[in-house]
Amino acid sequence: MTERPHPPWDDSYTGGTPAPWDIGRPQPAFARLADEGRLTGRLLDAGCGTGENALLAASRGADVTGIDLAPTAIARAREKASARGLAARFEVADALDLGRLGLTVDTVIDSGVFHVFGDGDRARYVASLAAVLRPGGACYLMCFSDRQPGTFGPRRVRADELRAAFSDGWTVESVTADTFDINPVNGTTQAQAWLAVIRRG
């Protein structure tokens, strides 16, 4: 796969301190979605990190592929899958070029990927999702919210920005306030988020 310039995401997994998002368990919002029976069928976790959300879906019977730019994260996700006896697949790949995977999936999950992209790459990312998600398929997307105070963390996203990004060929069914669980940053263990349910038209 052709490499593009990216932030050094692998560095987030090679230091002695876990990255804020690498909490060692699924995000509660995705655990709720799993409990509601929504993480089903052929499922892609775009930006899976060390795999906790993907492995949760696999444990509930989904046919899971997880991708991430960070080789160390993918290696850890594969180790977890093996240790837990789960058949999830994990690949080093670019979320901006998902069509190269040759997949068609029923469900996409995004836990903290959309908010890393600038304006130019947002449209590319949405097109990349459309390349793999079947018509009528669901995307469950969780991103940093403009309701988050302070300056730490990624770019804040407004709900209307999220809706605008998916205005062409998609139906945004809901955008609701939620929270990320995070490793402690400045004394806090949660960050304000939006959880969007988006269906491909």
Regions picked out by a protein language model, each given a short descriptive name:
Residues T2-L44, T50-L103, F117-V132, G137-G201:
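Class I (Rossmann-like) S-adenosyl-L-methionine-dependent methyltransferase catalytic domain
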Residues G112-V116:
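Short catalytic micro-motifs in class I SAM-dependent methyltransferases
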Residues I109:
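A conserved beta-strand element that flanks and buttresses the S-adenosyl-L-methionine
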